[in-house]
Amino acid sequence: VYGAIFSADRGAVDELLPRGLEPIRATPRRAAVTFLAVEYHRIGDDAMPPYDEFSVMFPAVETGARSWPLASLFTHGASGYVWYLPVTTEPAKALGVDIWGYPKEVAEIDHDAHVAGRRTTVSAEGRDVITLDVERAPAIDQVQEGASYTVEDGTLLREPLTLDGNLGAWPFSAQAEWTLGDHPRADRLRELDLGSRALARLWFDGEFVIGAGEPVGTV
């Protein structure tokens, strides 16, 4: 996994969150968006062929939960509301939609590894959505827990996440860049006034476990 966290307009992010969630603040007036470019090499007990994925997530907490500007991003940056989740195969889409309510769509995801890291381009319906170029962050072996939030049939779900492996985050990095395309999703992201410098770049290699969704409210 290569990823990065960028600041975004707080009001614009809040408009995209379902009722029951509020954005984690990067500053008093800014929220954040996390981009994650993922290669799944093995799914469960080889339940399906490997596939690629690109996550657009807004770091968020349940309404009323305590969070601290910026500090909470470094502990919850890979947690939050999953807004867009393109994948490269139909079985991967079906698994995510049917079990967890993830907003998965089939798209083209191209990874281009280079000496310092990896460049990932997502395109759908013949249009580019986003390109993310991230240098690998220093990592150590560790276990981290978090949560993703999705909406299914009008219910807000919380899915516990566990990451077990080599995980690293490097703050305030110029070694992560995004470029938006001409797809409608890109236009929506453009409206968020994304920051040009990453609040952090991320790298992970290990086991990623998603727990069953737990209802936490209605939307």
Residue spans for each PLM region:
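Intrinsically disordered, low-complexity boundary segments flanking structured domains
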Residues: P18-R25, D45-D46, D164-G165, R190
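Structured soluble/peripheral alpha/beta segments that form catalytic or ligand/cofactor-binding pockets
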Residues: V1-G3, P23-V143
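Interaction-surface and assembly-scaffold signal
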Residues: P86-V219
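A short linear-motif detector with a strong N-terminal bias
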Residues: D14-E15, V33-V38, E62, L156-R158, ...
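Short, extreme N-terminal leader segments that mark the start of a protein/domain
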Residues: V1-I24
